[in-house]
């Protein structure tokens, strides 16, 4: 059970920054703590913490670049009873200490582990990550499997899909001739990130997201984060990220993905790669949302809160995944699974062609959703759906969940 801080290495320090007046943020969530890093050097962190008694567990929120813990304010506000929500600012980011040193992804994962240990977070834990925070959160998850209850991801990536050279916007910012100017000397990268949303975010929200990054000194880690993205072999973090990307395939815990499909950074190829690595994931698309999906679709917080509720309400023997119930080797959906990557048509309805690939993905999503909603093997399910591709998908999903269609 996640506990209140008891570790002697944790020290409360100074006053938290004055965050009063920031839209949607309760200033009482803000706190500063000092924790030794793996070299034993004391490091001062800023974090948001709703302070709830973790009856069910803790949600560990990990932001990306160039955001900060403010990104997660909606989830702190929407958290169901019994869930503690902790959202730290990475070292060098937000209102955490500027260490003066570039920190690689493996160091940031280790930093996060030392922080959670000092905060007394020992499970159950649900990780949630966005942007570069996605792979850091997954790195923490892989290092703390015994504490891990679930994984949530929003518009992120763990690998470059085959044939992909990386997001053009990030590759541009990554160039040695561009990065010092665009990411550090000027707020171009910081302000450009908030400009990806359309309609535009309210000015006060854009200003709040940029608040910790007002000077070049405070933006140094923004450039360091970009420099640490391994686009090719030989990069200092390439092997670490590749190992993490493969390790993710072994995470068999319940998983939720929430996605802004208008993202010019992490498009559909990155989502497809994640779903291939985490096939049990339930997906929520928020149409019209871009890269900052938490801002463009604030209702994501309600979706995550509902999913957290499912984690604690579903019977232990019914996983929140798309894994079939106990069946023989050959099932009613075996043929569909065998052709899950086949783009050829499986059916045509009213001029609309449905591929084997899309049908298999839809059945997987629906089956996981049915299990999460409480459908048990042997349950009788009535369907009020007109003959269509949707009906076919729902029937197969019901069978896969172990239900009987009547």
Placement of each model-derived feature along the sequence:
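Alpha/beta-hydrolase fold catalytic core
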Residues: 1-59, 80-83, 121, 227, ...
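Conserved AMP-binding/adenylate-forming core of the ANL superfamily
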Residues: 38, 44-48, 344-396
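Active-site loop/oxyanion-hole signature of alpha/beta-hydrolase fold enzymes
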Residues: 41, 48, 87-129
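Conserved HGGG/HGGXW glycine-rich cap/lid loop of the alpha/beta-hydrolase fold
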Residues: 50-95
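Catalytic histidine-centered segment of alpha/beta-hydrolase-like enzymes
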Residues: 289-301
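A short N-terminal helical cap/helix-turn-helix that marks the beginning
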Residues: 325-346
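Short hydrophobic alpha-helices that are characteristic scaffold elements of the AMP-binding
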Residues: 396-404
């Amino acid at each position: 059970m996640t506990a209140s801080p008891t570790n002697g290495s944790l020290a409360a320090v100074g006053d938290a920054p004055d965050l009063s007046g920031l839209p949607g943020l309760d200033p009482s969530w803000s706190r500063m703590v000092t924790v030794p890093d793996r070299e034993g050097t004391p490091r001062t962190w800023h974090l948001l913490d709703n302070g709830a008694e973790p009856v069910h567990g803790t949600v560990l929120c990990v932001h990306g670049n160039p955001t900060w813990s403010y990104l997660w304010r909606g989830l702190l506000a929407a958290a169901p009873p019994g869930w503690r929500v902790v959202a730290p600012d990475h070292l060098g980011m937000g209102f955490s200490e500027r260490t003066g040193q570039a920190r690689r992804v493996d160091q940031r994962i280790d930093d996060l582990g030392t922080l959670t240990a000092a905060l007394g977070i020992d499970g159950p834990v649900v990780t949630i990550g966005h942007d570069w925070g996605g792979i850091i959160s997954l790195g923490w998850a892989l290092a703390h499997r015994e504490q891990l209850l679930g994984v949530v991801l929003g518009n992120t990536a763990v690998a470059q899909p085959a044939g992909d050279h990386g997001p053009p916007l990030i590759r541009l910012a990554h160039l040695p001739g561009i990065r010092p100017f665009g990411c550090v000397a000027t707020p171009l990268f910081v302000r450009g990130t908030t400009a990806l949303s359309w309609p535009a975010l309210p000015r006060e929200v854009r200003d709040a997201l940029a608040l910790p990054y007002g000077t070049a000194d405070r933006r140094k880690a923004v450039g360091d984060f970009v420099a640490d993205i391994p686009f090719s072999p030989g990069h200092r973090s390439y092997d670490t990220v590749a190992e993490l990307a493969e390790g993710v395939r072994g995470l068999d815990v319940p998983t939720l993905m929430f996605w802004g499909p208008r993202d010019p950074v992490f498009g559909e190829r990155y989502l497809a790669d994640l779903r291939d690595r985490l096939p049990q994931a339930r997906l929520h698309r928020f149409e019209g949302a871009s890269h900052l999906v938490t801002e463009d679709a604030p209702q994501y917080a309600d979706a995550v809160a509902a999913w957290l509720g499912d984690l604690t309400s579903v019977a232990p023997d019914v996983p929140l995944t798309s894994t079939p119930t106990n069946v023989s080797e050959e099932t009613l959906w075996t043929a569909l699974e065998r052709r899950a990557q086949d783009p050829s048509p499986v059916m045509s309805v009213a001029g609309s062609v449905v591929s084997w690939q899309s049908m298999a993905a839809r059945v997987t999503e629906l089956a996981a959703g049915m299990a999460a909603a409480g459908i048990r093997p042997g349950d009788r399910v009535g369907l009020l759906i007109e003959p269509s591709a949707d009906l076919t998908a729902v029937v197969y999903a019901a069978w896969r969940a172990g239900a009987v269609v009547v």
